[in-house]
A protein has these predicted regions:
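N-terminal amphipathic alpha-helix/helix-capping segment at the start of soluble metabolic enzymes
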Residues: 1-17, 159-172
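Hydrophobic faces of well-ordered beta-strands that scaffold small-molecule active sites
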Residues: 15-21, 44-48, 91-95, 120-122, ...
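Alpha-helix-loop-beta-strand connector modules within alpha/beta enzyme cores
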Residues: 60-93, 139-174
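Active-site-proximal loop/turn and secondary-structure-junction residues that shape catalytic pockets
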Residues: 19-23, 50-54, 97-99, 124-129
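Acidic (Asp/Glu)-rich catalytic clusters
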Residues: 5-10, 35-42, 78-88, 109-117, ...
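Flexible, glycine-rich active-site loops centered on histidine and acidic residues
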Residues: 101-149
Length: 175
């Protein structure tokens, strides 16, 4: 169910949860156990945040420095899959402009569609540590409004669903 439908059909207040994907090294069971106490409140949906990957500069033997990608967290898509495997609750992953090319966003949309996830929070995202201003990823989106248009354009083509012979719907993703 789309979160917009949940909100429109609600006559009383209800909780929702927002979680940050855990650091690498946590098990699936530990993740689900950490969420369990909140499930007693019967949330209608769970938001799963997303953050840019970080980089660090390491000195090479010749004295120069090279940039190395650091991925400290489990992906929001993986966290959504874990939640869906145990709980009957809508998951709402965040997609961000920063750190993603347009093609990487489309790949994430393919994965979300494959999993049956059709709710998304589209954000520009934060600047990288040490940046004074947000710098878009080359080949990516600069603004959340561009990301939303990219998602709408993607869902309009329903590339993934058509390639799998599934029913198409121009309103597949709720943004």
């Amino acid at each position: 169910m789309k979160v917009s439908e949940i909100l429109a059909g609600s006559t009383k207040a209800y909780p929702s949860i927002e979680i940050v994907p855990p650091l690498r090294g946590i098990t699936n069971e530990e993740l689900l156990e950490s969420i369990a106490p909140f499930m007693e409140f019967k949330p209608k949906y769970i938001n799963v945040t997303s953050h840019r990957d970080e980089y660090e500069f390491r000195q090479n033997e010749d004295g120069t420095f090279s940039r190395h990608l650091i991925r400290n967290r489990i992906s929001e898509t993986t966290v959504c899959a874990a939640i869906m495997s145990k709980y009957d609750v809508e998951v709402v992953p965040h997609l961000i402009c920063g750190g993603n090319t347009k093609e990487e966003i489309e790949s994430r949309l393919d994965n979300l569609a494959f999993m049956g996830i059709n709710n998304i929070v589209a954000l520009r995202g934060d600047s990288m540590t040490g940046e004074k201003r947000f710098s878009p990823t080359p080949g990516g989106y600069s603004y959340a409004s561009e990301l939303v248009e990219g998602i709408r354009s993607y869902q309009g083509s329903n590339a993934y669903r058509r390639s799998r012979g599934l029913q198409t719907d121009d309103r597949y993703f709720c943004i």
